[in-house]
């Protein structure tokens, strides 16, 4: 007998009033939802199955209902981008705390990618990543990719740790 693990299903939401579909014409103040496609590609690259979800607008009720609908799909993980900083319209962190178990809001000492929200929502691992595209991808690689590897029973996706000593400063 050979032990096997099924491929994790990862629901992906972007959030923000400024986001539009990638094929939409841009109006002033709008940006394309490029994070959805970048994250889908990374999720596929690491052997999981992406579940693209609608954009979550900057509205508490819409975010709650959107995440609840996503939970009904029974994903193995949920990833959101944007809405996790301290802005007046950044509601993902608040809703994640309301809906979640042991949800942590962190300021990680790295750039790009300082804000991070993680924990469980409805028993499902939840990762709230920054909305900045570079920060989103860096955070995915550092935090989400190792979690997906573990869900699959793999060790090759887990980032190695290296210790070093700084011998000179510029």
Protein language model regions, located:
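A general structural motif
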Residues: 30-36, 57-63, 106-115
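Flexible glycine/proline-rich
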Residues: 95-170
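N-terminal small/polar loop signature for handling phosphorylated ligands or for N-terminal nucleophile
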Residues: 40-99
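Solvent-exposed alpha-helices and their adjacent loops that cap or buttress functional pockets
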Residues: 2-6, 44-45, 69-72, 109-110, ...
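Short glycine/serine/threonine-rich phosphate/pyrophosphate-binding segments
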Residues: 21-22, 86-90, 136-137
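A generic local secondary-structure boundary/capping motif
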Residues: 1-4, 30, 67-68, 106, ...
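Short glycine-rich anion-binding loops that position phosphate/pyrophosphate groups of nucleotides
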Residues: 17-18, 83-86, 131
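Short, glycine/charged-enriched hinge/interface segments at domain edges or termini
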Residues: 1-57, 68-69
